[in-house]
Amino acid sequence: MMKMRWLSAAVMLTLYTSSSWAFSIDDVAKQAQSLAGKGYEAPKSNLPSVFRDMKYADYQQIQFNHDKAYWNNLKTPFKLEFYHQGMYFDTPVKINEVTATAVKRIKYSPDYFTFGDVQHDKDTVKDLGFAGFKVLYPINSKDKNDEIVSMLGASYFRVIGAGQVYGLSARGLAIDTALPSGEEFPRFKEFWIERPKPTDKRLTIYALLDSPRATGAYKFVVMPGRDTVVDVQSKIYLRDKVGKLGVAPLTSMFLFGPNQPSPANNYRPELHDSNGLSIHAGNGEWIWRPLNNPKHLAVSSFSMENPRGFGLLQRGRDFSRFEDLDDRYDLRPSAWVTPKGEWGKGSVELVEIPTNDETNDNIVAYWTPDQLPEPGKEMNFKYTITFSRDEDKLHAPDNAWVQQTRRSTGDVKQSNLIRQPDGTIAFVVDFTGAEMKKLPEDTPVTAQTSIGDNGEIVESTVRYNPVTKGWRLVMRVKVKDAKKITEMRAALVNADQTLSETWSYQLPANE
């Protein structure tokens, strides 16, 4: 038996060191497909209680020793650092290095870390394994390596470009989000990272995803820059039927903003990682859905065929909109998903979850296909995710976009010039754009508006905004039943020419 094992290892080594050998997503897909045909094995924690039961402040004390960054002794611009297990990051992930001739496991060692005041026995953690990893790159200065990618927890990953700070997250896959049965969170259980050459400007990462009802193989090509772009290829296999599959999911946070002001006095006018869902539908329509922090779970679906793009955006970059020196929400990126090929019929879905503070991610957006194959059959999805602070460049230049949405008590100016509340809710929506700024200010811009059965549009007016060189829509709305949601839409036109994206707003219930 020992001889056979040695022979098998020798054969594998020969394959890995063959000059014709090259690692690819197909190698990961074979494992994913094999896993899909077997019963799910839940990951087992090997974490000592001192790490499992620690508080966040203690976990923060465990820091990677920067002098021991992986590839530190190579000329490659990319470096790797690793996350230690602790708290709810209590199961190890395997991390491998891929070279031109071989795959090599990157082994855990406590010597990679400094532990602060955390008391531990080195012998009990010597084979612990990592919780995840981060990628460093000289994105802001050629003399300094900054973190640009973090892969930690379930299938979450965060990415930033030049001058950005971490905000929203992307995920590999979402299953049954917002369904009564409860959400299932797939996890990346193993990674393979290609060793980059000194001249490489991109980093390739492969990942094996596992979950009770799905497996998957992923290839991520990270291209850092002013906008960091991640090219994603995924091969997904169902173990069992799911209620809903979320492809290219994005996760963010919205606590309050001018469309839904803070119920308590707060020096910060806005507090969010993203303030809207942008969609470029298959028929060419652009849609903007401002985000809410509802009192009850809210799910919005936008049905279409072959989406051209969608993303959770942070529109409005002035520091004065946030006034937060610690968390710098003005520097947090937007994330824009651009599908490759035809994704067929389905929906872009937005999930908004009530939250009382900014520590909870309460916003999710993803693509969900109408039809799913039988378990075991392969699904392929290719797309890019662009992490950017230049939201106007994510939009068509000839189509105006919503710069801000503000909610106010509706009022009417009396003959004595005093404004008197009239029982309505007023929405102030500013539209701007490169082509719109070229229009003469006397252009007869009007609004096409509509509202659902639970509301009535009392008045809508459009006027030129000389500050933004765009147009401002003011719409006064009367809600029939405040216990129900109210849907409304608006777009700017000039005669039969559509000038703007569609503002699609949902006023939450009980507001």
Swiss-Prot record:
Pathway stated in the Swiss-Prot or TrEMBL entry: Glycan metabolism; osmoregulated periplasmic glucan (OPG) biosynthesis
GO biological process: beta-glucan biosynthetic process
Keyword terms of this UniProt record: Periplasm, Signal
Compartment(s) where it occurs, according to its Swiss-Prot or TrEMBL record: Periplasm
Function: Involved in the biosynthesis of osmoregulated periplasmic glucans (OPGs).
Family the UniProt entry places it in: Belongs to the OpgD/OpgG family.
Protein name in UniProt: Glucans biosynthesis protein G
Species of the source: Shigella flexneri
